[in-house]
Amino acid sequence: MISIRLKDGSQREYPEGISLLQVAEDISPKLAKNAMAAVFNGKISDLNSQVKEDGCLELLDFEDERAREVYRHSSAHVMAQAVKRLWPESKLAIGPAIDKGFYYDFDSGHTFTPEDFAAIEEEMKRIIKADYPIVRKELSREEALQFFSERSEDYKLELIEDLPEDAVISTYQQGEFVDLCAGPHLPSTGRLKAIKVMSLAGAYWRGSERNPMLQRVYATSFPKKSMLDDYLQKLEEAKKRDHRRLGRELGLFVVLDEGPGFPFFLPKGMVLRNELENFWREEHRKAGYQEIRTPIILSRELWERSGHWDHYKDNMYFTTIDEGDYAIKPMNCPGGLLVYKQNLHSYKELPLRMGEMGLVHRHEMSGVLHGLMRVRAFTQDDAHIFMLPEQIIDEIKGVMDLVDRFYSLFGFPYHVELSTKPEKAMGSDEIWEVATNALIKALEERGMEYKVNEGDGAFYGPKIDFHLQDSLDRTWQCGTIQLDFQMPEKFDLTYVGEDGGKHRPVMIHRVIYGSIERFIGILTEHFGGAFPLWLAPVQVRVLPITQRSQDYARQVVAELEQAGIRVEADFRSEKIGYKIREGQLQKIPYLLVLGDREAEEGTVSVRHRKEGDLGAKLLEEFKQTIVKEIKDKVL
């Protein structure tokens, strides 16, 4: 008998060789029905896996990201099986799960079109209905090469050849279909429910232009049709909220052919941007930060010293000045380090917090540029904190508090991810371990749950990333906290300690918005262009019904402007219904309709963007209400 400890701490005895699915069924048939994979002794496994030793078991359902990956990876195999049935000459490349779905790359003589989607979906449904068991089999390298050679699956052969000599090679079979795969997978194809083929794209094999162009078929899947319907509805809503369209329609920003990747901000967009920057400055002033500004162009020697030249050169822009090599900064940190070095610092001054709204430039391939979300020039709300080693935990927690204040203001829930040492990194393993443990301790002391991203840290240190969730349930990585022991060493940063000697400070790099441009893009789609009152470029539009009420309209505009409210008036000779509809399309928070009665009584007829007609109010009453709403930054 073997002993299995469950997540709730309880323990059960089972005969050796029982499958994880059988264990789940013994615990609860409903639990087994919803389970998609399991973690046994820390390793994610198929539910069909047999248990041969004591261990700890956690069953995963669709709510768990790891289970969603298994579900959609199995979905990709079903789609590949369907394509092979419909177009047998198609060769298989790769088919991973991705965020919100999956894809499979094919080398096929058939050119896929959207008209093929229905046929692929129908064949997938037949495979799902057949409920084929999904069976794992391990092979020797020779067996695997022979198997896929007989089937002329050239891409699979290349993958096998590139595996390490000691790699475990496995296949998964469902019905007649067999694929090279490490797994894990669902117990059977019948576990899949709602599927939808979404789109097509071209993709070079292994991402290299030197390799063949493959056809990539994107799709998604969910365990319930209602979940798929909800996802598709949100996709449609996302199209309506596309920040590129809204940016132009609302007069916020544009990206022109004359400057690909370099956005133009229009007057209303600058109002929005300035409000965000003003709020940033005020909150950072209250949190003890000093603001600096560093040059956009700095010498090659500086970038070599910082390590950016070696690690980031392909993403940088360069120029020559007085026969010397210079680079346009892709990051603000080296400039901040030079500012620190301008003075001798005592331990009594630390922590020293310096913030910068710094314009940076990064070379991005034209194919990945996307409105404000992916650009070549953007403003980072960078800050660098220089501190004593014993201040690390408190400073990290202080940044977390600031991040929470910002994201809560906009109504963004968020989750946290910890990224550890990447393959290409500066510094020793020991320093990386100290830095990583400091971030973990700060997270745990603040009681924050977090996910670990192995190997995804910056080249100079581990980091905490903040992923906010918008109104369409999409996640965006914006804020980050990076702990750095490397740069202070490279730039010979020091402070005078209590003992009178020179010591090395520790450094935090952090952003909250991340990129002002990208954050504005996210806000535009999150609110669908209907920004909170305090952010709205135009907060009130005054709509006189007739020429007789225009003088009163000018008086209302003047009073509201005097109170610091952003107001404009529409004096055109259009019908009032037309003016109201246009104001609604422009997503202006308050429309004030003014006729003869309002002029006589000193009132305004108020229409709210969400609540509709609020009736007549005294101008002074309305003014006080809106001033308070702006001051309180109401959502």
Curated annotation (Swiss-Prot):
Catalytic reaction annotation: tRNA(Thr) + L-threonine + ATP = L-threonyl-tRNA(Thr) + AMP + diphosphate + H(+)
GO cellular component: cytoplasm
UniProt superkingdom: Bacteria
EC number from the UniProt entry: 6.1.1.3
Enzyme class: ligase
Protein family according to the UniProt entry: Belongs to the class-II aminoacyl-tRNA synthetase family.
Subunit-structure text: Homodimer.
Protein name: Threonine--tRNA ligase
Organism whose genome encodes this protein: Syntrophomonas wolfei subsp. wolfei (strain DSM 2245B / Goettingen)
Gene name as annotated: thrS
